[in-house]
């Protein structure tokens, strides 16, 4: 179970960072990155 939680959190952080890069390159303006 601990491995599942660790994998889920890792996937969440990875997808979140990818979203930050995509939103930053789109020049959305709502997020200042």
Swiss-Prot record:
GO MF annotations, alphabetized: electron transporter, transferring electrons within cytochrome b6/f complex of photosystem II activity
Intracellular or extracellular location(s): Cellular thylakoid membrane
Keywords for this protein: Electron transport, Membrane, Photosynthesis, Thylakoid, Transmembrane, Transmembrane helix, Transport
Broad class of the protein's primary localization: membrane
Membrane topology listed for this record: Single-pass membrane protein
InterPro entries from the UniProt entry: Cytochr_b6-f_cplx_su8_sf, Cytochrome_b6-f_cplx_su8
TM region(s), chain numbering: 2-22
SUPFAM superfamilies membership: PetN subunit of the cytochrome b6f complex
Entry superkingdom: Bacteria
GO CC annotation: cytochrome b6f complex; plasma membrane-derived thylakoid membrane
GO biological process: cytochrome complex assembly; photosynthesis
Subunit description: The 4 large subunits of the cytochrome b6-f complex are cytochrome b6, subunit IV (17 kDa polypeptide, PetD), cytochrome f and the Rieske protein, while the 4 small subunits are PetG, PetL, PetM and PetN. The complex functions as a dimer.
Its biological purpose: Component of the cytochrome b6-f complex, which mediates electron transfer between photosystem II (PSII) and photosystem I (PSI), cyclic electron flow around PSI, and state transitions.
Family the entry assigns: Belongs to the PetN family.
Protein name per its UniProtKB record: Cytochrome b6-f complex subunit 8
Organism, scientific name: Synechococcus sp. (strain CC9311)
Lineage, uppermost ranks: Bacteria, Bacillati, Cyanobacteriota, Cyanophyceae, Synechococcales
């Amino acid at each position: 179970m601990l491995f599942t939680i660790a994998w889920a959190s890792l996937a969440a952080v990875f997808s979140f960072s990818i979203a930050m890069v995509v939103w930053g390159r789109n020049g959305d303006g709502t997020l200042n990155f």
